[in-house]
Curated annotation (Swiss-Prot):
Keywords: Hydrolase, Magnesium, Metal-binding, Nucleotide metabolism, Nucleotide-binding
Sequence positions that bind Mg(2+): D72
Summary of the function given for this chain in its UniProt record: Pyrophosphatase that catalyzes the hydrolysis of nucleoside triphosphates to their monophosphate derivatives, with a high preference for the non-canonical purine nucleotides XTP (xanthosine triphosphate), dITP (deoxyinosine triphosphate) and ITP. Seems to function as a house-cleaning enzyme that removes non-canonical purine nucleotides from the nucleotide pool, thus preventing their incorporation into DNA/RNA and avoiding chromosomal lesions.
EC number of this enzyme: 3.6.1.66
GO cellular component, one term: cytosol
Protein name per Swiss-Prot or TrEMBL: dITP/XTP pyrophosphatase
Obligatory cofactor(s): Mg(2+)
Record text on subunit structure and interactions: Homodimer.
Catalytic activity: XTP + H2O = XMP + diphosphate + H(+); dITP + H2O = dIMP + diphosphate + H(+); ITP + H2O = IMP + diphosphate + H(+)
Top-level enzyme category: hydrolase
Note on how the cofactor is bound: Binds 1 Mg(2+) ion per subunit.
Length: 207
């Protein structure tokens, strides 16, 4: 399990940092953030969540000499061809979560019922300074509401309704959200892999 191992979280998003710290707590790792280092992060130019997560994790691991964990995640609306996808954090060039939510609702105003189905996807990449990297993924199906509900969470959480739970992510606390969320599922996959120590590299490495 490597309790006390220092790992750098490569996101500056406070919501993601909070959920990652909560989810990784059982491992006993010492979690650092980008605020602990003077790094200029590379642009996220990957075409997939995996490419972006690998880019961030590998860069930070090499720059700091420490293992680095990157989270690249986003919302995919089926009727919009997978938008916003890898552009979730900068959708439509909007600057804030609220503006992006409004923009998404505008893009979906003609969609009803089944046409509003969507999913959240999360890819975690844990990269080591020697170049080894591992990926853990999670996804959750849901529906985009026609108006926001709830005060918690971040990003598109107020719009993403989880039928199984009967509420949006923004209506859930951290623990409940982790049970259902894409990030929670990816974190559980990582926890399972590390429950008896680091997984065999020939099994866990990214091809």
């Amino acid at each position: 399990m490597l309790r006390g191992m220092k790992v750098v979280l490569t996101t500056g998003n406070p919501g993601k940092v909070r959920e990652l710290k909560e989810g990784l707590a059982p491992l006993g790792w010492t979690l650092l953030t980008l605020a602990d280092f003077a790094l200029r992060m590379p642009k996220e130019e990957g075409a997939t969540f995996l490419e972006n997560a690998l880019l961030k994790a590998a860069y930070v691991a090499k720059a700091t000499g420490l293992p680095a964990l990157a989270d690249d995640s986003g919302l995919e609306v089926y009727a919009l061809g997978g938008e916003p996808g890898v552009y979730s954090a900068r959708y439509g060039g909007r600057a804030t979560d609220r503006e992006r939510n409004v923009y998404l609702l505008e893009r979906m105003r003609h969609l009803k019922g089944e046409e509003r189905k969507a999913r959240f996807v999360a890819v975690l990449v844990l990269a080591y300074p020697d170049g080894h990297a591992e990926a853990y993924e999670g996804s959750v199906e849901g529906v985009i509401l026609e108006a926001p509900r709830g005060e918690g969470g971040f990003g598109y959480d107020p719009l993403f309704y989880v039928p199984e739970a009967g509420k949006t992510f923004a209506e859930m606390g951290l623990e409940e959200k982790a049970r259902y969320s894409h990030r929670g599922k990816a974190l559980r996959a990582l926890l399972e892999a590390y429950k008896d120590g680091p997984p065999p590299r020939e099994v866990s490495k990214l091809e």
